[in-house]
From Swiss-Prot:
Encoding gene, per UniProt annotation: rpsR
MF terms (GO), sorted A to Z: small ribosomal subunit rRNA binding; structural constituent of ribosome
Family in the record: Belongs to the bacterial ribosomal protein bS18 family.
GO BP, sorted A to Z: translation
NCBIfam families the UniProt entry points to: S18
Lineage, broadest ranks: Bacteria, Bacillati, Actinomycetota, Actinomycetes, Bifidobacteriales
HAMAP family: Ribosomal_bS18
Record keywords: Ribonucleoprotein, Ribosomal protein, RNA-binding, rRNA-binding
Summary of subunit composition and partner proteins: Part of the 30S ribosomal subunit. Forms a tight heterodimer with protein bS6.
Its job: Binds as a heterodimer with protein bS6 to the central domain of the 16S rRNA, where it helps stabilize the platform of the 30S subunit.
Record Pfam families: Ribosomal_S18
One annotated Gene Ontology cellular component of this protein: cytosolic small ribosomal subunit
Name this protein carries in UniProt: Small ribosomal subunit protein bS18
Amino acid sequence: MSRKRPQPPVKPFKKKPNPLKAAKVTEIDYKDVALLRKFISDRGKIRSRRITGVTVQEQREISKAIKNAREMALLPYATSGR
């Protein structure tokens, strides 16, 4: 006979607050560089929605806006430095 080990209590999942709703942003624009920089890591990568706390649709719009801003030379593709 084997005995089951008691399981530790599971903490309830706490959802991150949406930063776009907190800032009352209705439209994501590639020209709003200050907003887009919040969703880019210090290495220049686009942060995942698991980290940022945005919805799927908002993440798609953010990534498109960041890519457009990079193409228009408003944002760098990568950081300069070591």
